[in-house]
Amino acid sequence: MGIQVAVRQDEITDLVTRIRAAIREELNVSSRGLPFRAWDISRAGAVLHMTLTPEGRNSVLDETLEEGRIGWEGETTGSAEVISVLPALSVVNACLTTGQPPKEGSLVYVNPPRYLEALLSLWEDGTRAAEIAQWIFDLGNNRIVWDKKVPFSVFNGLRPAQERSFSLVRWKTSFLWGPPGTGKTHTLGRLLASYLVHHPTDRVLLLSSTNVAVDLAILAVDDAIKDLKPATRPVLYRFGSRLDPKRFQDRKHLTPLRNRQLVDQLRQHYETIPDPAEAELYRKWKQERDRLRDAIRKENLEFLSKARLAAMTTTLAAYDFANLGKFDLVVFDEASQVGKAQAATFALLGKRVLFAGDPQQLAPIAQAASPDVNTWLGQSPFEWTSRSSLKNATCMLDEQWRMAPPISNAVSNLFYGSRLRVADPLSRDEVWIRGRSAMPSRLLGTQNVVLVDACAGARAAARFRGYECEESALLVAALVVDHVLSWSIADVREDIIVLTPYRAQRRRIEAELTTVNAPASTASTVHRAQGSERRIVIFDPVCPTADFVAGEEGMRLVNVAFSRAQCRLIVMLQRGWEQHPALSFLAKQHPPMVLNRDRVDELLLTKLPGPRPTRPA
């Protein structure tokens, strides 16, 4: 194993003190809740359905808020427990626990599950905290500590960088950098499958911060093992009660339960929530809910020691940290979206650790503003890769399979130091080439990357925080109609996505799409789009001079938006775009154009075929 870096006790103590203080500060600030506006509120018994729009820069609606709490007017008027979050629709389903539902348009505060409390309790154990701090200092002496190999030749079609990534697990700490379209999850699945099959006594802990990421990662490993057809199949288990039952319908071997109906029973139980006003009935309902949760957790723990690979969320791992034991390898997927304090904590569970993610896309979110909170909770472990001891332990996947060459070049030059390229085999793939060839339309030519000057500026939004631009919203609707008709698109939502960083602009675009009979759900905010891809992406930055779009985090949003596109990327330009680093760079290769106004007006009078969509969600 690696040699520990000699560190004075006072240095250990100082680091522990600073990280503890950072967690406490973030816990204190986050306990106030993330601010949202509640709209479209309906009630069925004790279940509330509502659309939430963010009121703060850090108010991101995703599934990590499940099992959190919602309060309004300081929780003196009412509160609810979050049952489920549908990020694509900005919808939350919650169980009313006190008071009356919030009023339309009122301010509500969402408190995430008390994950930080569990993290803080781990750091308040003096011995454990000192061990984690020592692990952090030892990064300066990172080295190869495992002399075995993980074969990659057992799989066909791996690219050179993917093959190189199989050697990462030999290092004490390593990083798999997966830019968009490079097949990070696919690679990770094959790496871990080969590792488990060829090293039958080793155990792996697979972590991620969201249930969706955990599901997709373990399914990738399971698929790869299926391809290998080993004589003895390694035991993989997905722990936790928040897995997606549909994904695991034909994968019962991944569910660590003797009574495999427990998860279904829990979901069905949530469909029968009584009105909290019926106190006794509600009390019994909560008792049964807790009984089912405890039964799932108890059975999970009984199966833990049998698992060669245990997959779970970091939230579950934080609460069950003491029961997890030690693993030969800890793999942290989407690690670029968690803070360094969390990453170091869970790294302690393994002899070796592999962090996988993309530091150029969405970063961890911390609400408190102090330097230590930013360093330990607002920066990902990928910040460590600049150290000389970690450079050789980092592998970037450099061939992508999604974007047409001009889009790929733009993303590569802007965000990946010109290292990302179209996968070599695709140069001979006629089907792929045809699918990435942009056809002309009434408004555009055959370019893959198009910059459209809206000849207008952003305005402060009336109903929501942020900005909106009516002129660009109209042009976006015309461009959608143009491509549906010119490209004979049957399902708009399958082929086109409209991305914007501002909810106000999303609502305005949704309204314009509705007038031309296009699905309002074609429009999305950038945060919700990570992980998706479409043939055509229209990106509307709305206010290119705002720090939210032009700052460091804004550039990450731009990267996410650009890299969703397969065949055509259309970028709307408002006044001030010349000051935006990415937009001004792009304009040098792709000169902005002004759309023909008469053709735009004609397209806006067109009604697309099909049933009229429902009003925006």
List where the protein language model places each region.
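Pre-ATPase regulatory/linker segments immediately N-terminal to the P-loop/RecA-like helicase/translocase core
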Residues: 1-36, 40-164, 239, 244-272, ...
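C-terminal, active-site-flanking charged/polar segments
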Residues: 73-90, 95-99, 212-224, 228-246, ...
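N-terminal pre-P-loop "Q-motif" helix
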Residues: 154-172, 187, 312
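Hydrophobic residues on the short alpha-helix immediately C-terminal to a glycine-rich phosphate/catalytic loop
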Residues: 169, 191-195, 217, 349, ...
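Pre-Walker A (Motif I) flank of P-loop NTPase domains
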Residues: 170-176, 201-202, 308
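Conserved P-loop NTPase motor core of helicases/translocases
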Residues: 193, 203-329, 364-376, 427-434, ...
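Conserved helicase motor core of SF1/SF2 NTP-dependent helicases
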Residues: 201-202, 210, 315-332, 336-617
